From Swiss-Prot:
GO terms for molecular function: cytochrome-c oxidase activity. Component of the cytochrome c oxidase (complex IV, CIV), a multisubunit enzyme composed of a catalytic core of 3 subunits and several supernumerary subunits. The complex exists as a monomer or a dimer and forms supercomplexes (SCs) in the inner mitochondrial membrane with ubiquinol-cytochrome c oxidoreductase (cytochrome b-c1 complex, complex III, CIII). It is an enzyme of class 7 (translocase). This is Cytochrome c oxidase subunit 3. The gene is COIII. One of its GO terms (cellular component) is mitochondrion. Keywords: Membrane, Mitochondrion, Mitochondrion inner membrane, Translocase, Transmembrane, Transmembrane helix.
Amino acid sequence: MSTHANHPFHLVDYSPWPLTGAIGAMTTVSGLVQWFHQYTMTLFILGNVITILTMYQWWRDISREGTFQGLHTFPVTIGLRWGMILFIVSEVFFFISFFWAFFHSSLSPTIELGMTWPPVGIAAFNPFQIPLLNTAILLASGVTVTWAHHALMEGNHSQATQGLFFTIVLGVYFTILQAYEYIEAPFTIADAVYGSTFYMATGFHGLHVLIGTTFLLICFLRHINYHFSKNHHFGFEAAAWYWHFVDVVWLFLYITIYWWGS
């Protein structure tokens, strides 16, 4: 089918990146299981390399299509907006499953857990130490990404650059603190249902922070190369929506698992 028909919609060309992305994701998850059971990270690292290369090349192609070829017309961006909204909704339900598992176990702890929460022998984190600092960091990053967005809409290139830079720095800082918390944790993912739900929920949130930080880094690189304008910057908007979603999920995690659950 011709991609040059007289209509405003973008009929994409054949692309290998969905296939290589699926292979990378499958290899990463398989490697994670192998790492847990056979203590070798080879397959896990290979999967990550494939996934990162796919992300780089897919983002490169989308940037070319939207910025240099002008294929992201107004009707196309409306479709992209709805796609991002539905993706975030699916992510909300993904995290609901973790909260469901947590409350299922914590609201009525069984006799195997000592009929108490946290279970007998589990020393929970102090919610007013690193978790509270992480909360402040993510809330601050929400402010800086909004600052960058408003600056971009007003055509203020330097302030948008500063806002994006500070958001990325705060995202990296959050990830470092989360990794430090995991290293110092007095329990593991194998320590009862508390360890399982804690690491699954906070670990997947940490993964989303990494993805969001990467998303913002791509936007930062595109922004300093003048890919965005006052009226045409959906890539940045999508990253900002995703970052606010990550903020809100962390607030729920902090209130339920760290504060109430401790």
